[in-house]
C-alpha cells in the first residue's frame, strides 16, 4: 500500500518495542509510532502493573532514536490529579513527541475504572490550555472520549487542540469526518 500511496503517512501502535523491531517497522514504511505514557510516572502504578513507566519511555526513546515521529499522550479521568497531568506533559515535552492524543476516560462496566467520576469539561479545557502552553509546537489531538465535552468540544479548538482522530475507537464510538469538518469550519478555520 505504501508504494501506491506515497503521500500516505503510516502510524503503528504495537506496544513496547525494541529498537530493532521499530527499525523493521520504519523499513516497512512506518513514519510515526503511537505509544501513550497513559499518565504521570507517579500515578502509573495505579493504571498498569504488567510493565513499567520506564518501559514506555524507553520505547518512545527507541522510536525517536531511529528517526520515527512519535504520537504519545494519555487518558484523563483515571483518578489522576492536575499535577499528574502536568507532570506527564513535561515528560512528553522532554521526550520531544510530535503529537499528543488527548483521551478522556469513558468508564466501561466491568473495568477497574468503571466507577470513576467524570472529569468536568472545564477541567479538560484547562488541561488542554496548559498542554498548549507547555508544548506550543506539538500537535494536540482530540482522541477518545471527546464527546464527554458536549458543547465545549469546539472550545477545545480555541484552547489548543489543532488536530483530531475521527471515527470510532477501540471501545467507544467517536464522530464522523463530516461532523469534524463542520465543527472546524464553523469556527472559521480552513481544512
Where would I find each of the regions flagged by the language model?
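Alpha-helical scaffolding segments of alpha/beta enzyme cores, especially the outer helices
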Residues: 3, 20-27, 55-65, 87-94, ...
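Mobile, glycine- and charge-enriched loop segments
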Residues: 1-2, 9-12, 57-76, 128-144, ...
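Alpha-helix N-cap and loop-to-helix initiation/capping positions
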Residues: 48-55, 80-87, 115-123
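Short, flexible active-site loops
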Residues: 68-77, 85, 106-116
